[in-house]
Amino acid sequence: MQKIRKGDEVVVITGKDKGKRGTVLRVLPTEGRVVVEGVNVVKKHQKPNPVKGQAGGIVDKTLSIDVSNVAIFNPATQKADRVGVKTLEDGRKVRVFKSNGELVGA
């Protein structure tokens, strides 16, 4: 089970964007990376491509960051938190915050 999923609110805990909060737009599990909204934004100089209908210029692009550089945001404590996996009585696995044991996304 993935501890960070698409739609989770995360906090960057290390790197040039440390302290920024954003929503996970995409998870790349094979690469161990996530794309977070408003984090690791770079400027790309793009040539015009009339075949695809693309205009040229400087475009902002959001790149992925390593999943170890983000932590899920716990709304109860208003801090970054770790995530654990708990099995319920009916056999389902759910994600829980390590600090207070509450369900993630509940």
UniProtKB/Swiss-Prot annotation:
Keywords: Ribonucleoprotein, Ribosomal protein, RNA-binding, rRNA-binding
Family: Belongs to the universal ribosomal protein uL24 family.
Keyword Ribonucleoprotein (UniProt): yes
Function: One of two assembly initiator proteins, it binds directly to the 5'-end of the 23S rRNA, where it nucleates assembly of the 50S subunit.
GO MF: rRNA binding; structural constituent of ribosome
Any one GO cellular component localisation term in the record: ribonucleoprotein complex
Assembly notes: Part of the 50S ribosomal subunit.
Biological process, per Gene Ontology: translation
PANTHER family, A to Z: MITOCHONDRIAL RIBOSOMAL PROTEIN L24
Claim: Cell membrane is one of the keywords in the record: no
Name of this protein: Large ribosomal subunit protein uL24
InterPro entries per record: KOW, Rib_uL2_dom2, Ribosomal_uL24, Ribosomal_uL24_CS, Ribosomal_uL24_KOW, Translation_prot_SH3-like_sf
